[in-house]
Amino acid sequence: MQDYKQPLRIGVGGPVGSGKTALLEVLCKTLRDTYQIAVVTNDIYTQEDAKILTQAEALAADRIIGVETGGCPHTAIREDASMNLAAVEELAQRHKNLDVVFVESGGDNLSATFSPELADLTIYVIDVAEGEKIPRKGGPGITKSDLLIINKIDLAPYVGASLEVMESDTARMRPTRPYVFTNLKEGVGLDKIIEFIVDRGMLDAK
């Protein structure tokens, strides 16, 4: 019988550079005084994202595990999630009252999804700099994630992207699922993300 709490596992996916690690940094810093949090990061050959979070002092180093997936990072969150499941288990044993473990996927494309064995909730991050066409390209990250984050809205004028078009396309691609427009560097939209995590994750409001 396990002697530790089963934490809520939240998968965070999205293309390289969309803001996944930035999202985790700000979420950890905002939530860590209220909830017991840990993070698993995935990189193909390094533990770069784990180092970034540690150096940013988002969490104590013993609350972050970097998984080196090798090969295809999609496999490590979907078809064979064993390394990630083991990392979540290790963190839950190390910190027996964990409320949340965030699992950040390696940089992936729009078709990557998390195994339901690994993630109870999924958040997918795209960014305005990729162009306003990204939402209408679809893919499971856009259409099936529990929350879609459209980040870097401050860059819209510089890349010729219309936020109105992006919102219209997003609403059409995921008519019943929530989405948030954010500028994580400035904290814009962060309150809505936290509200989603607390409500959908059924965390005790504190």
UniProtKB/Swiss-Prot annotation:
One of its GO terms (molecular function) is nickel cation binding. It comes from the Bacteria. One of its GO terms (cellular component) is cytoplasm. It holds the Pfam family cobW. Its main location: cytoplasm. SUPFAM superfamilies: P-loop containing nucleoside triphosphate hydrolases. Facilitates the functional incorporation of the urease nickel metallocenter. This process requires GTP hydrolysis, probably effectuated by UreG. This is Urease accessory protein UreG. It comes from Aliivibrio fischeri (strain ATCC 700601 / ES114) (Vibrio fischeri). The gene is ureG.
